[in-house]
Amino acid sequence: MDEAHSASSRPASSPDGQVPLGEGARVCARGWGWRHAGRKNAVLSGVDLDIAPGERVLVLGPSGSGKSTLMGGLAGLLGGAEEGDATGTLTVDGVAPAEARGRVGLLMQDPEAQVVLARVGDDVAFGMENLGVAREEIWPRVENSLEAVGLSVPLDHSTTELSGGQKQRLALASILAMGPGLLLLDEPTANLDPSGVAEVRAAVETVVERTGATVVVVEHRVDVWASLVDRVIVVADGAIAADGPLDEVLAQQGDALRERGIWLPGDDVAAEVGPAPKVPPASSESPEGGARGTTPITRVTDLTIGYDASAPVRSGIDLTIERGVSTCIVGANGAGKSTFALTLAGLLPPLAGTVEVETADGTDGDPHEWSSKQLLGRMSMVFQEPEYQFLAATVAEELAIGPRAAGMTDEEIAPLIDEHLEALGLTKLARANPMTLSGGEKRRLSVATALISAPELLILDEPTFGQDRGTWLGLVRLLRAALERGVTLVSITHDPAFV
């Protein structure tokens, strides 16, 4: 069963190949809660909730408040007793979500995580094949679903050649083809450029209008989905803090929502962060050595990047990155930004051209040729997928890995861990397993693990995704402090406020 395209239990037959239409699903929670295994406190508790068939609901809340846990519960993906403990009841159409997956479809944050097969048509057909849909129905449904989400590519088009927005629409088409009555959207635009956000938003609206499905969307920002939803539920401190029509909740609790970290329309966080530090004159030296803002730390010359020399992603890249300066790299999904970041960090060899890094201690050259010991303390990388970085059983142990490898004692490491936990709002999670954190918490931990090793050059791939207003400010201030210490920052981002 494909959890990325989460739906099961065979839908009704449709002789003309149209996706079968029916009533939206009904959602009911009574005293429901969830506690992750190994955690002392529940993520959610005492949740009472009714969502009528066809309702469109926006779920808001600060990072780590339990929004994604609620979505996982509704999708039947939280697991059994070994994963955690549930209390109360949570049902979809009167049955436990795990028994109603044919009525539930889940669209997640990461476009890459939801592509299953190599060709577009096969990917949409995959879920229906698992459900036992008649073969003569599958391909008409594939075509109808792709048309509904506005993805006009040949059925044999390679899924690897799709942009992030196209991959999200492909995942949505795969869900639509299975005919769910409940559509769950867990920050589906978090990793997309502005055009991708618009594409997915329009596709969701079309799907909802055609199917009458019940919609529950989790998002940190109100403005993306405000015109689609008719109700908002605010989750905070492990419980429901507000529930009602969107305009009414915003009017009555706007200030309280902002205090809880919700991004409201018109918010300008740049004023709270303050202006970026000016590059000092050429005589000003950064702590790591070299004239900050005038001495290159990295030179890229005629670079070709990619995973296969026969199909390069980008070529002819020339770039100079100045020491002690923050550089943001922007562009459309699929433009090769993440591939460039991996090449810059020495984790992917150049297909052609050169990457030259000059460190303060004279360790120069292409970082791809450096040993792990040479990379430590000189360069760090924050991956787009935080889970790729996690090695330890607890958050505190994760933060200790880099300093310990650098030869620091436990007495030296402990205050560093406390400092980073507090700065990023993770203190209460010090003993938690990193894999049980929310998406936003994982992102902040991944940034902290990179910063705590005190690198000269820090490369970040989408450093602010999944953050509420408050945690965004904390993360940006931490990076600003690193910049003022002389750390060179290179960030891949779609976040205009961060730029």
Positions of PLM-derived features:
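Catalytic Walker B motif of ABC-type/P-loop ATPase nucleotide-binding domains
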Residues: 183-187, 458-462
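ABC ATPase C-loop
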Residues: 175-176, 450-451
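ABC ATPase NBD Q-loop/coupling interface
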Residues: 87-100, 349, 354-374
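Conserved ABC ATPase signature
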Residues: 158-162, 166, 433-437, 441
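Hydrophobic anchor residue at the start of the ABC signature
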Residues: 172, 447
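Helix-to-loop junction immediately C-terminal to a conserved catalytic motif
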Residues: 75, 345
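Conserved ABC ATPase "signature" region
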Residues: 136-154, 411-429
